[in-house]
Structure formats: C-alpha cells, structure tokens
C-alpha cells in the first residue's frame, strides 16, 4: 500500500493500521525529516518505507514512481490534502494564488499520483486507487453553504476526476474510488472552525475506511 500525506492525521492512522496488519507500507510525505511520529513508527516496524514526495512536485512523483517501477502496489491511498486559509476563501476577498495551491494539492496532485503509479497498481492483486473526498465537495449537501470556496471546488474537481479515472482504468482491471472519512479530529478540521460534537478519531475513521477499501470490487463500482 502507498499512502500520501502519511505524516499525521488520517494518513498516519492508515500507516499504523496497514503496517500492524502485515502490509508493506510506502509512507510518503513532503518533509520526512520533520515527521517525528512517522519516523518513530518506522523504527519500531520492519514493513514501513518512508519516502519524500510532495504531491505538487511532479518531478518528485515521477522519480518515486520510477523507483517502484515493477513493484506491485495493491492499494494506492490518495490522502494528502489541505483546507487553505479560510478568510481568503470568502467572496469579495478571494485569494487566487491560494486557489492555485489548494487545487494543486487536492485535485491535480491525486490525479498525477494515480497516473504515475498506475502501472504498479495494474500488476498487483487488488488493483485499487482510493482518493479522499469530502461532503464539502457535494452539490447536494453543500451547494448553498457560503464558505470554503477553494476547498469545495477542489473536492468537486477531484470527485469528477476519480469517476473519469475509474472509467479510464477499467480495461486494466483497476478500480478508482472515492472514500469519505467523516468528521475526523484532525488539524484540517480544526482549521475549518468546526465546533460540532460528532468528531471521531483518525483511528476510528481509518478502521471503517479500510473495511470499505477491502470490500470495493469491480462489481460494486458498476
């Protein structure tokens, strides 16, 4: 399994879960040297491989994909994501440089990572690419909610991207799916200003997500 944004939050919980259950885990993040919890977890494990990869740096993505060329990756988890500065996502005060950054991380990045590692996924047994989405990207749920312009637009974009990716990769037997973690107690949720009581821990979220990932099949994606 390859997991992006694995240094904290949901990504780190994915690394914990999969490594504990005997998977070889390629844990990627922007700054491995600053990922203290991840480094400690690796030292106490034999199946975690930490790699530097910024999902907005296409050269880094291509280099890492080359390194693992011919190595089967059963599950690719596109987890890396950012919310972005909230006040700068209000109409009348929109920061379009920030828009580029949020789109680069949340929409362009997952698509590029999937494209770069698709050959490794194709030669695996499970052949799954899963990408984190959010209810904030839903027209039905959040269409009338006036905050988080860029985050919402980036999630809507990657939602369509993954649907199109699934159609594009079916001939290779690859499944591309969206998964939503729920209201998880992470730095991103804190940045959003959410004050609700229904938050769950990253570990709780991942326990449910890995079951969904395990049950995803070509039949369930029809």
Residue positions per predicted region:
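Conserved Rossmann-fold SDR core element
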Residues: 159, 165, 169-184, 220-222
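C-terminal helical subdomain
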Residues: 178, 186, 190-222
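Structural signature of the Rossmann-like NAD(P)-dependent dehydrogenase/reductase core
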Residues: 3-4, 78-79, 128-134, 175-180
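Conserved glycine-rich Rossmann-like NAD(P)H-binding loop of the short-chain dehydrogenase/reductase
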Residues: 21-36
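The beta1-alpha1 cofactor-binding region of Rossmann-like NAD(H)/NADP(H)-dependent oxidoreductases
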Residues: 51-63
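Catalytic loop of short-chain dehydrogenase/reductase
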Residues: 82-83, 90-103, 122-171
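N-terminal Rossmann NAD(P)H-binding glycine-rich loop of SDR-like oxidoreductase domains
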Residues: 7, 11-16
